[in-house]
Amino acid sequence: MDIRAAEISAILKDQIKNFGQEAEVTEVGQVLSVGDGIARVYGLDNVQAGEMVEFENGTRGMALNLETDNVGIVIFGADREIKEGQTVKRTRSIVDTPVGKGLLGRVVDALGNPIDGKGPIVATERKRVDVKAPGIIPRKSVHEPMATGLKSIDALIPIGRGQRELIIGDRQTGKTAIALDTILNQKPLNVEGAPEGQKLYCVYVAIGQKRSTVAQFVKVLEEQGALEYSIVVAATASDPAPMQYIAPFTGCTMGEYFRDNGMHAVIIYDDLSKQAVAYRQMSLLLRRPPGREAYPGDVFYLHSRLLERAAKLNDDEGNGSLTALPVIETQANDVSAYIPTNVISITDGQIFLETDLFFQGIRPAVNVGLSVSRVGSSAQTKAMKKVAGKIKGELAQYREMAAFAQFGSDLDASTQRLLNRGSRLTELLKQPQFSPLKMEEQVVVIYAGVNGYLDPLPVAKVRAFEDGLLSLLRGKNVEILNAIRDSRDLSDDTAGKLKAVVEAYAKTFA
């Protein structure tokens, strides 16, 4: 075989010329100690607060405590594989998550990774999870209704797009049921081809719940056809505390994508008590000083910076909105505990759910007297304002009278009338789960209640009366419902027609 020296030297020269000196410089630190989901790391002198770091085995973590001689890192995953002396490298990126419409219909973990087995997520953008809330100038006052489909809420405690309304109550009082019904009620708005200004996308963040509970929730959404316009972010009870802490921020960032692009979204945090507990655990393990109930001093800021991101933006910013429905679980109806008082003071109103009402069969178990919406009737349609104004006053009087009526047996006629009306209105506000009503249907039902058409009926017949009236209006008299829906008002002409229909129906019903 003939070896040509010139040819070999030419090849060698070519190889040397194209030899890439690609040395990657990464800043690394060393694990000093690890345990309870917290790693102390020496080095990483230039790491940023909130920066994502990577351990040798690929597990991610987030730098939270920047001290003089070490960095406290919370670990997003199991800490079993991480050993003392291993290296940790910076990623130079603050914790972020994929955003966009590609997430709709998916179930993701607290870092935005899919956990539903439907393949990778199609997302073009990534956003930081912890960003500053919009200032005062880009905002606009809340004025559009965000219908939940529940009579007791839409009539008495109306929620507007861009509002923050707290759902608070003991365990097993139906807090998640209200959230679920609210998501299901958006189905008619999210039909194919509907204008973006009408649609309302839903983000549900499950924090510290059982996996079976989250799976059940997703199953209901799927069965009812609501998953296609929803995103579920799940940090279950078996996930480490840092995941439960970051999940609400991840969900909020996904919701903000819609808000900032002129669309509308609602986000449900279920529940923030568990996020506060996870944050307390992390803070204590990082040796931050404890405060009231052993929560850290900045637990108020934790929730306020999250909930301030829900906003209604003005026309220059695209008119989008993000509505927040945080859930808080109380212990034995104690709303004066630390976390409940904090969140009550941050939000624009609260829906109180009570165990006693729940067991009396009043479901949704809303205590109408203690619940408020600080946005109020500016978030209601004109039609609803006209009929719901009366019901508030009548129920307030009923509650006052009912307390006194327990003492005396001989009541005058007007008091008796008031008690009768109140008990029927209370019955009218009951509603089974998964059966949200459209705004126009709620208006006609409440109209019948406040105008005395239920007074002659026994309380047990109220539900049957309501169902019959609605099926009559959906069938023969659908033009009345359409008129209320299209004008969003109850004009004198429509009210006259409605009165005639209800009167005729009431006569036949007896």
UniProtKB/Swiss-Prot annotation:
Site positions (Required for activity): S371
Reactions mediated catalytically: ATP + H2O + 4 H(+)(in) = ADP + phosphate + 5 H(+)(out)
Subcellular location: Cell inner membrane
Cellular compartments per GO CC: plasma membrane; proton-transporting ATP synthase complex
InterPro entries noted in UniProt: ATP_synth_asu-like_sf, ATP_synth_asu_C, ATP_synth_asu_C_sf, ATP_synth_F1_a_nt-bd_dom, ATP_synth_F1_asu, ATPase_a/bsu_AS, ATPase_F1/V1/A1_a/bsu_N, ATPase_F1/V1/A1_a/bsu_N_sf
EC number: 7.1.2.2
Alphabetized GO MF terms: ADP binding; ATP binding; proton-transporting ATP synthase activity, rotational mechanism
Keywords: ATP synthesis, ATP-binding, Cell inner membrane, Cell membrane, CF(1), Hydrogen ion transport, Ion transport, Membrane, Nucleotide-binding, Translocase, Transport
Pfam families with a match to the protein in the record: ATP-synt_ab (PF00006), ATP-synt_ab_C (PF00306), ATP-synt_ab_N (PF02874)
Quaternary structure annotation from Swiss-Prot or TrEMBL: F-type ATPases have 2 components, CF(1) - the catalytic core - and CF(0) - the membrane proton channel. CF(1) has five subunits: alpha(3), beta(3), gamma(1), delta(1), epsilon(1). CF(0) has four main subunits: a(1), b(1), b'(1) and c(9-12).
Family statement: Belongs to the ATPase alpha/beta chains family.
Function recorded in the entry: Produces ATP from ADP in the presence of a proton gradient across the membrane. The alpha chain is a regulatory subunit.
HAMAP family, per database record: ATP_synth_alpha_bact
Protein name: ATP synthase subunit alpha
